[in-house]
């Protein structure tokens, strides 16, 4: 199911809960294509016109789905934007922008591609938004903004899902060709007892 409220009235959760063991929640890729926003934010940012977050999705779904059936998600890919307006006070969220040709035409790029193409050597600085718990890269010269999950934002998500006692999935495995992100998941859930409630 999608993490945003869009199309929510199409689901009869009372009926589905009788037959579905768990729900993979697509809590990523709700970006607007004409305004910069984080790909997979854990918490909301008031300047993000999309006004969406994983935490928001969880609190929406917990009213309709048993907690032990909820599996939230992380992204092993990112989105690249060209910002089309001036930047003031380093605020890059909520700016007029468009997806650029990246690894794919829609601005989509795997995590391994981000590491090799949107790094310090290519003029990018990497930032962590402490409010939304989101990582992004930005090039002040070209005004290219890239939003994605990295080990820091992924650890924040893992702590969240452990606290809520829900599960974690990701999309997709092919984006992590050196297993950096997979290792973060393993290292930060190691020793956790596997059971139906936690799904770790």
Placement of each model-derived feature along the sequence:
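Glycan-binding loop/region signatures in secreted carbohydrate-active enzymes
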Residues: 76-159, 187-200
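Substrate-binding surface in catalytic domains of secreted glycosidases
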Residues: 1-112
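C-terminal helical cap(s) of enzyme catalytic domains, especially alpha/beta-barrels
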Residues: 36-43, 179-194
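Generic structural signal for well-ordered alpha-helices
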Residues: 13, 54-59, 158, 179-186
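Short, acidic/polar
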Residues: 5-16, 147-162
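Active-site rim elements
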Residues: 47-48, 142-149, 169-172
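A short, acidic, flexible beta-alpha connecting loop/helix-capping segment that sits on the rim
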Residues: 172-179
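Conserved active-site loop/cleft motifs that coordinate metal ions or position small ligands
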Residues: 71-73, 167-172
């Amino acid at each position: 199911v999608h993490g945003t409220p869009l199309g929510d009235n199409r689901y009869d959760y009372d009926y589905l809960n009788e037959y579905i063991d768990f729900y993979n929640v697509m809590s990523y890729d709700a970006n607007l294509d004409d305004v910069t926003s984080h790909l997979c934010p854990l918490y909301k940012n008031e300047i993000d016109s999309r006004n969406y977050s994983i935490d928001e999705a969880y609190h929406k779904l917990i009213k309709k789905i048993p907690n032990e059936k909820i599996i939230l998600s992380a992204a092993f890919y990112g989105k690249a934007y060209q910002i089309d307006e001036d930047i003031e006070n380093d605020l890059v969220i909520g700016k007029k922008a468009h997806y650029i040709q990246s690894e794919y035409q829609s601005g989509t790029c795997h995590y391994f591609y981000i590491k090799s193409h949107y790094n310090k050597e290519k003029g990018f600085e990497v930032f962590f938004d402490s409010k939304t718990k989101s990582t992004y890269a930005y090039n002040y010269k070209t005004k290219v903004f890239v939003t994605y999950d990295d080990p820091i934002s992924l650890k924040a998500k893992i702590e969240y899902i452990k606290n809520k006692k829900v599960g974690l999935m990701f999309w997709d495995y092919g984006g992590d060709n050196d297993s950096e992100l997979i290792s973060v998941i393993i290292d930060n859930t190691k020793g956790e007892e596997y059971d139906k409630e936690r799904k770790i």
